[in-house]
Amino acid sequence: MPALTQHSTSITLFRISAAMFLNYLTIGIPLVMLPLYVQQQLHLSDLLIGIAVGSQFIATLLTRGAAGRKADTSGGRRTVITGQFYCAASGLLMLVSLIAHPVPLLAWAILIVGRVLLGIGESFILTGNLTWGMWLAGSTHAGQVISWNGMATYGALAIGAPLGLSLYARAGLALPALLVVLLPIIASGVIYGIPGNIPTARPRVPVLRVVGLVWRPGTGLVLQGIGFATLSAFTALWFNERHWDNTGFAMTLFGIAFIAVRFFCAKFPDRYGGATVATFSLLVEGTGLAVMWAAPSAGAALIGAAITGCGCSLMFPSLGVEVVRRVPPEIRGTALGVWSAFQDLAYGFTGPIAGLLTPFIGYQQVFLLAAACALLGAAVVHLLLRQH
């Protein structure tokens, strides 16, 4: 770790978090806009739209381990720069797909390749940034590093989605695609001059061994992620079924509460311990989801969404502190990558599984199941992490 003062460390962490925000805008900008392009301009089916969206998630999930090994062997800074290259390349392929627009399936296939590159870039940037930040600040500030990165990523997703829609409405796909190309270049300028760590050569650690080290906090991440995935996938459908207004405000209030708690409580995991904060957070998340399930009106459901955001906010940094505490520094990047994949699993499989259940139990009961998972997660995290 470099010899940095507290002040210079904060400035450096702010710079790499700002770069993370710019990099994650490349993910937020196409988030809502791209499905509309595939539907309205390419006139393709919902199945192909779903593949276009899901291909990025699959690429991220499958490359978490590779990104972690890259961070452990080449350093966090180089891993981030590699991820930026992939993200910029995805924007170039979005532009190329415009040329193939007269042949919709060809244009779609080019977009899929771009989405895969974007998923790889996301994996490398997130894992590299966390590894790099912890090397700069020290493992005792792991919670703060993860919290600042989380604010950057969720802020970019919250801003990027409406920004992408606005740009698409004004100029079609070209302007959002061009911005996706330029943003990683701007982010590279933000991190220019920050020292990077060059790890010493280490033997490669089997992924299964790493899984054995991180499955306890990973289990908590899965049970927490079910709640967020349920809220993001089914709130609009449930509000529509109830004929409630202000559907979009659920995610807005969730995001505001999420970022506010991250901002004001970023040091809680380092101060009070990851296991304690994670257990309390899951209890709050479960309460919020239960409020949504029992809500008699849209207003009550929106309050539940905000409470859920408060509960979800510190889960990633608090469990991340536990991961850092349980693994040796030389495999920290791999461990963070493998552990993050647990969240990808929750986000990827909750929607399809819940979608199979909704014809039988309805949208409302899905929130009850999600609340039960969060409360179960509180008990599991308390037992597994406290006893280990």
Swiss-Prot record:
The keyword Cell membrane applies. It is found in: Cell inner membrane. CDD domains: MFS_YfcJ_like (cd17489). Keywords: Cell inner membrane, Cell membrane, Membrane, Transmembrane, Transmembrane helix, Transport. It comes from the Bacteria. One of its GO terms (cellular component) is plasma membrane. This is Uncharacterized MFS-type transporter STM4428. HAMAP family: MFS_YfcJ. The chain crosses the membrane at residues 18-38, 42-62, 89-111, 116-136, 145-165, 171-191, 219-239, 248-268, 287-307, 341-361, 365-385. It is a multi-pass membrane protein. Belongs to the major facilitator superfamily. YfcJ family. Its main location: membrane. Disulfide bonds: none annotated. One of its GO terms (molecular function) is transmembrane transporter activity.
